[in-house]
A protein has these predicted regions:
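AMP-binding/adenylate-forming catalytic core of the ANL superfamily
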Residues: 5, 10-11, 26, 31-115, ...
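Short proline/glycine- and acidic-rich turn/helix-capping motifs at secondary-structure junctions
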Residues: 120-131
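Short basic/glycine-enriched coil/helix segment immediately N-terminal to the Walker B
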Residues: 22-23
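Flexible glycine/proline-rich
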Residues: 14
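Acidic/polar alpha-helix N-cap and adjacent early helical turns
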Residues: 142-147
């Protein structure tokens, strides 16, 4: 998604200089991935979160939306883990409204096989202590330690 408007910020201050937010034509790259359907823009997710598994692109936010539709799910995050065969594989880190639920069967007809998590982990309380937003980087590091 790229934006251009008359009311955009001039830039940000770095090392004593104003650094422009826009390219030479005045466009700002949001680093969001979007899709346009019938004149309506839908934000799909952050480009920084996109990863590949067996040559297939996985946008974590798309998978998270599907899993979050289950009534027992309070929060879900999809993070990549390194895999020798596929490059990366998706792992779900979840918070439930009660004891953990097996969602691997539930997602089979809702997600493509490459999008289906290979592991389902419960969100640890220590990752929720930093405020409202949970860091994807902290989640990735935590998942790596669980290997």
């Amino acid at each position: 998604v790229w934006l251009r408007a008359a009311s955009m910020a001039e830039g940000y201050w770095r090392n004593g200089q104003l650094v422009s937010l826009v390219n030479d034509e005045g466009w700002y790259a949001t680093r969001d991935r979007g899709e346009m359907h019938n004149g309506k823009l839908t934000i799909v997710g952050r480009l920084d979160n996109l990863f590949f598994s067996g040559g297939e692109g996985i946008q974590p936010e798309e998978v998270e939306r599907v899993i979050a539709a289950h009534p027992a799910v309070l929060q879900v995050f999809i993070v990549p883990v390194a895999d020798k065969e596929f490059g990366h594989r998706p792992v779900a880190v979840m918070e439930y409204d009660h004891e953990s639920v097996d969602l691997s069967e539930w997602v089979k007809d809702k997600l493509a096989r490459f999008q289906q998590p290979v592991r389902w982990l419960t969100l640890p309380p220590e990752l929720k202590n930093g405020g409202i937003k949970i860091s994807r980087q902290a989640l990735k590091e935590w998942v790596q330690r669980q290997q």
